Amino acid sequence: MVWIWATIGLLALVHILQAWWKNKKKRLPPGPRGFPIFGSLHLLGEFPNKDLHRLARKYGDIMYMRLGLMPTIVISSPEAAELFLKTHDLVFASRPPHEGSKHISFGQKNLIFSEYGAYWRDTRKMCTIELLSNHKINSFKSMRREEVSLCVESIRAAANNRGVAVDLSDKVSSLSVDMSCRMVLGKKYRDEEFDERGFKSVVREAIQLASAPNLGDYIRFIAPLDLQGFTKRMKSVNKAFDNLFEKIIEEHLQPNDGERTMDFVDVMVGFMGSEESEYRIERPHIKAIMLDMLVASMDTSATTIEWALSELMRHPKAMKKVQKELENVVGLDKMVEESDLEKLDYLNMVVKETFRLHPVAPLLIPHASIEDCTVNGYHIPKKSRVLINVWAIGRDPNAWTDAEKFIPERFEGSSVDVRGNHFQLIPFGSGRRRCPGIQLGLTVVQLVLAQLVHCFDWELPNNMLPEELDMTEEFGLTVPRAKHLLAIPSYRLRKSA
């Protein structure tokens, strides 16, 4: 065992000396000095986005640090984000190696974590045109209406028990899972149809493992040792998904009787075996994209809805303002339709403000530099990991007045949106690696939020005051509430609605 650690130490020393010699005459961005091998990993705690924000105040909005042996650039202002995601977009369009994606997502064949190249370009094109186009999103409109109505009816039944709180976090999460499964896989899956751990449990474990600080991501040559035991768990999760996806693909290869709605898997199966691109699309590629679509659609939307409801309950005036707008646009005789969403200006301001204060992925997904590059006079080494701290950007006092406060009205008359064109608000990223599912995500978030606020009045349990609502976060691949949101509903539409 001693010789293993001695070898690791020697290899690390050689790596550090090579990097130092290569970069010693080049001007790197300012940043903290790190320790041998581990770099500045010790500076990151439970909430890395907040720790990096604190360091950026000292070193600047373009900061260099080593995390393990990985050269890392941290971006903390809209101006710096524009340089990396627009001016030099192509250079930073790749992804660093990721142990979680390697073992869970079928060899990093998914869209989110795959390296920049022909496979990523063709896969993104397929997803954008075939899976996430406005036409495809609209084809699932009736499904969304049905699932949201079921959720409303469930809460309405609970509201009959006056004074009893509903677990809104659980309700929204279940709704998001059901919609995602029907859209991607063609039907809802009960836990017992998956394996003994249950569908939702395995999805949560996959997200947890993908976001866990894995030493193998930062000190690459120790990854095979699996010192933290993550690899074994990742392979177990992958096996569970593989078994399910194999069964689903086989079902979709059978002739459609005409009664089943075409879902995402039908589209992807149609590409299987195709050699029109530089590679042949096989089952592992389809399974990786299926997993991407599931996790990205179910977890991100639910987290944003949960935070938006939390902020509205903490700010009763904003809640009343949203409800008043819904009364004027929709009326109290019926539920919200998707066609109403574009008329709900204040609701859309609430959604933007929620994305600003509670970005689902506060550091986005890490970018990687394809080659050496000079940005703003700084040398950025090839294969650097680039972290865009959108959490810090959303709180930049140079970009936002009263940046820590929830003020939806700040967007009144403003052209700022969340689609990656305004770098002070980029919850979906920007440039080539911008999330291709923006329209789907916005539609789901706006529809579910509007419906829950329109159909019900909400009261915090145990006579809790709005300012007493716990807003603690739980950091991961996404950042949900640490504690579930509980609230007492009372139905507010006319009884015939």
From Swiss-Prot:
- Write out the transmembrane intervals: 1-21
Q: Where is heme bound in this sequence?
A: 435
Please provide, alphabetically and separated by semicolons, the GO molecular function terms listed in this UniProt record: heme binding; iron ion binding; monooxygenase activity; oxidoreductase activity, acting on paired donors, with incorporation or reduction of molecular oxygen
Q: Which InterPro entries match?
A: Cyt_P450, Cyt_P450_CS, Cyt_P450_E_grp-I, Cyt_P450_sf
Q: Which Pfam families match?
A: p450
- Name a single GO cellular component: membrane
Enumerate the CDD domains for this protein.
CYP71-like (cd11072)
Question: What cofactor does its activity depend on?
Answer: heme
Report the protein name in the record: Cytochrome P450 71AU50
